[in-house]
Design a protein with these regions (language model features):
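Extended, folded cores of ATP/NTP-driven motor/assembly subunits in large transport
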Residues: 1-374
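Conserved small/polar residues in nucleotide/adenosyl-binding loops
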Residues: 375-383
Length: 384
């Protein structure tokens, strides 16, 4: 991690992170929803196949002291101090009642492949500028995170059971011989069993969402973030080169047509109507042709999506209850929740806002099927 916010994840992969706020998508009128949706589709189409990005939605509990500091209004020694105190008290009461002590943040992490930092830095800065301009056109408040802020985010996730303030300075590294990892690492990790893990005093479980529906429902993400518990929701998205995507779909259509011809030959030999073919072939053929039309004429791109959910809880019972809740949410939208058996460590690492995806479970989706990343604007937000 460097002070400017660039992080070297592997020997050749460098990433940066942008924190962004939400917009009132769920509360908007249908016309406004359509405009927001189309603008977000254009936002996603900006990414080419060389840029993999990660959308992170983090719900973490915070101490009352943290909330109190964030909304405190210091007195100024004038006749309005009474109003300031009353207003701060009202904010604290509303905050404690409104979100059950949860801080909800959203991040976009993007990365490029490069031989060294010198080659990666100008590309990352150009992409960052373009993304900030795209956010601005969407009417979304966004800001890039520097190295200290990215470490702070990681500290809050990895040490969520301690709720201690993040203490770090770049000047401390050389004299102490420590690295940035020493300031954010939890007290312990334990990946003994294949279906859950322990981080500090908390138990966790990493699952992936198996997307069976043709597209993601715009309410599913909102339901995840409305849970009153610590949860990390991550979408790893990799754009597929448009030419390769069209070639792949055409090959699939050719394979389906070949299978259809074979079935028709069987029908003729068996003496029944050759138009009677398996329903799956007819369905898949029509869907493949529709997908090809979307890619060629509707400004759609193909994306490979990995959908990960991390639940954290202090006890096994609470963790099981949270997993049951998440499973109910995904089933409501024609998806299934699958535990990452013996991949908990890789799954948790892929759920940190680092832009690294170590889970090779991907689902092909089009632009419009992927664009579900807005819910509603919270009244309270941490300052960007």
């Amino acid at each position: 991690m460097w002070p400017d916010g660039i992080c070297r994840v592997t020997d050749t992969r460098y990433t940066k992170t942008i924190q962004y706020q939400d917009i009132n998508y769920q509360l908007s009128q249908n016309e406004d929803k359509t405009a927001i949706f189309e603008a977000w589709c254009d936002f996603l189409n900006y990414f080419d196949s060389s840029v993999q990005f990660q959308l992170s939605f983090v719900n973490l509990s915070a101490s009352q002291e943290t909330f109190a500091r964030s909304i405190s209004i210091p007195p100024c020694g004038d006749e309005f101090d009474g109003i300031r105190a009353e207003y701060a008290g009202m904010l604290q009461n509303q905050l404690a009642r409104g979100n059950n002590g949860l801080i909800k943040t959203k991040y976009l992490t993007f990365g490029v492949e490069a031989d060294n930092l010198r080659a990666a830095k100008p590309r990352l800065e150009r992409i960052e500028t373009d993304l900030l301009n795209n956010f601005k056109r969407l009417g979304v408040v966004a800001a890039p995170l520097n190295g200290f802020e990215r470490l702070h985010v990681m500290h809050d996730i990895l040490r969520m059971d301690e709720q201690e303030p993040f203490r770090f300075s770049w000047d401390w590294l050389a004299p102490s011989g420590l690295s940035t990892k020493d300031f954010i690492a939890p007290s312990s990790f334990e990946f003994k069993t294949g279906r859950q893990f322990r981080m500090g005093k908390k138990l966790g479980a990493v699952s992936f969402v198996q997307i069976l529906a043709p597209e993601l429902n715009d309410r599913m993400l909102a339901d995840f973030l409305d849970m009153e518990s610590s949860v990390l929701v991550n979408l790893h998205v990799q754009s597929v080169d448009q030419v390769n995507a069209i070639k792949t779909v055409k090959r699939k259509i050719t394979d389906l047509d070949k299978s259809k011809i074979e079935e028709q030959k069987k029908a003729v030999r068996a003496g029944y109507d050759m138009d009677i073919i398996p329903s799956d072939l007819a369905t898949y053929g029509a869907e493949a042709k529709k997908l090809l039309q979307d890619l060629q004429s509707r400004n759609e791109r193909m994306f490979l999506l990995t959908f990960l959910v991390v639940n954290m809880a202090p006890t096994r019972r609470e963790l099981d209850n949270d997993l049951f809740t998440v499973s109910g949410i995904v089933q409501k939208y024609n998806c299934t929740l699958k535990r990452l058996d013996f991949q908990q460590e890789d799954g948790f690492l892929s759920s940190l806002p680092l832009g690294h995806n170590g889970i090779e479970i991907k689902r092909g989706m089009t632009t419009s099927s992927t664009a579900v990343s807005y819910t509603h604007l919270d009244v309270y937000k941490r300052q960007l």
